[in-house]
């Protein structure tokens, strides 16, 4: 199993089946015996995609004619993983992210799904300015949710409880990836 395929299966297990990401990731790493580089890529792809679900789902909502909840779980996992690579992994060439996503959609879905994935991912590259996060002044809850990877309901609760300034501080704190010992 290649790295992207392993990440795809992990995302399906977590997002569709409700598995715990840390357990899924540990099992895959033990089973697959990835090289150090592949292990780091796999881990970033899974955890990064999960951390960025708000933003990648926001993009899907803007670009897709279909509602996110009506998409096949295979299609949704492939799109999320592809969009994460396009928008957050600067060392992954866009062509590789798109092509590999299409291969996954074709292998685990069908040709129609592969075409849909290809169209949405390539469209996201052409329409980056349309996909900009609303400013804080336009929509503070959506801005903080997408920027700092927190759920909107939680942002609303924090703003009510602590005010906007302290909410920004909380968002920054909880989005910080801890340093390794």
Model-derived features with residue positions:
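Class I Rossmann-like S-adenosyl-L-methionine
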Residues: 1-181
